[in-house]
Amino acid sequence: MPLKIAVLKETRPNERRVALVPVVADKLTKLGADIHMQSGAGDAVKLADSAYKNVTMNPDPIALVRDADVVLTVQPPESSVVEAMKEGAILVSFIYAHKESELTKRLRDRRITCFAMELVPRITRAQAMDALSSQAALAGYYAALLGATNLARILPMMTTAVGSIRPAKTLVMGLGVAGL
C-alpha cells in the first residue's frame, strides 16, 4: 500500500508559502507516494492546481488528513485538522512548540509524530532538511529591500553628467549560520 501524503493550504494571514512544490511532488509520486492536496494550496505562490501532475486535489482539509500517513504544512495546523488526523500519522511542519504548547500536547495525546522543521539542526548531516537557513536568507533579503525603501536618500552611488550623489551608508546586523 503506497504512502498517502496530504498537503494543506495555509490559512494564517500573510502566509504565502506552500509545503510542496510540483517538482518535489513529481519525485515523490515516482517513488510510489499517493499525494492528495487541498485545492488552491499553491495559489499564493502562483502555482495552479494543474501544475501538480498525478496529485489528487480536494477542497476539504479534514477529508484530506483523515486517512493520511503524512501531513505537510508550513504553519502549524489548526486544531480541527489535528483532531481529524489518524493516530500514528506524521506531521511535517513548523510548529513552534515553545509557543504552541496546546498544539504540542494535542499531538502527543493523539500519538502523532511531528517533525518540527524549526528544530532541525543546522549541521552538514541535516543540510537537506534545513528549512530555517533558506527562510532566514529570504527574510534578510526582504529586510534589506524594506530598509532601502525607507531610506531618506538613495542607496547606490550615482554619477551623471550633472554631478554625483554619494551613496547612503548602512549597517547590516544579523546572526545566522553564515555569521557564526
What residues fall within each predicted segment?
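Glycine/serine-rich phosphate-binding loop and adjoining beta1-alpha1 elements at the start
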Residues: P2, E10, S79-K169
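Hydrophobic/small residue at the entry helix of a nucleotide-binding pocket
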Residues: A178
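An N-terminal-biased, well-structured beta-alpha scaffold segment characteristic
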Residues: P2-R106, R110
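Conserved N-terminal Rossmann-fold NAD(P)-binding element of oxidoreductases
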Residues: L8, L171-G174
